[in-house]
Amino acid sequence: MEKTVNPFRIGIAPISWVNDDIPGLGDHYTQDQVLSEMAELGYVATEMGRLFSQDPPSLRAKLNQYGIELASKFIGVLFSDRSRLEEELKTFRSWAEYLHDMGCKYAIVCEMGGSMHWDPRRAPEEKTIQRLTDSEWESLVDGLHRAAHICQELGMKLVYHFHAGTVVETAEEIDRLMELTDPNLVHLLYDTGHALYGGYDPVELLHRYADRIQYVHLKDVRHDVLELVRREQLDFRTAVLRGMFTVPGDGCIDFVPIFAKLIEMDYNGWIIVEAEQDPAVAHPYTYAKMAKEYIDRLVHHLLAAQKR
């Protein structure tokens, strides 16, 4: 096959091997196996996962061994709870400083208040989303702006990750967040799979907020499973275990207009394949290989078409 030249910086999250949201999935994988497979497939970056050391020198040495960079880490926050805001910002600063020490330029932030699975104030059996009040939105925005200033002090950018099962999930909520936040402070992490899950056409979202997107997560969606999840109102973890997400090229999302727009934008941030599945069902190496080959092939064809 003709070798493709991909101008994008493509990484992959360890969640394909070891799941951070669902304990027990992929526990048998070691960081050496995961990193070696990433490197073998041509990925150049990853994100923080629970299988990696949290000691910067140790992690840096391990990543360097395989020629992999750390792109960022998902940081769950409770900025919507005004009573916890100061403590949350202290915790955020410690993680931001950690990422800075690791050479990262981005901090991924997601509000956990009111979420299905990740709000520590709620009981585990509470699997509905508790939507934010106006005052909670105000606190969230305040926290994001202050956290973004911390990032700026460190030469980093804050990117907000809208996410299924959280209070910034739907098209209306994503638009509200973008409207309420300062575009010079709060940037957007564009996630194709979570956009579709939340009812936002991924192409429309990309075009609408192209000037605010600084980080990309690529995942695909199995349409039949998404319909089942909506019909039966399944919670997020159950949806993942049912196989709602998969890698780009294996689901119903059309990535041609997405990559065409990224090329038009001269996008130069990270693109991370982040497609959580049960590794016992979807073999991580096989699916990571499938994703990389699909992306390389698609980008090659789009760039070749430009030259005609």
Swiss-Prot record:
Its cofactor is glutathione; Co(2+); Mn(2+). GO terms for biological process: inositol catabolic process. The keyword Flavoprotein does not apply. Pathway: Polyol metabolism; myo-inositol degradation into acetyl-CoA; acetyl-CoA from myo-inositol: step 2/7. InterPro entries: IolE, IolE/MocC, IolE/XylAMocC-like, Xyl_isomerase-like_sf, Xyl_isomerase-like_TIM-brl. SUPFAM superfamilies: Xylose isomerase-like (SSF51658). It comes from the Bacteria. Keywords: Cobalt, Lyase, Manganese. Pfam families: AP_endonuc_2 (PF01261). Its EC number is 4.2.1.44. Belongs to the IolE/MocC family. This is Inosose dehydratase. The gene is iolE.
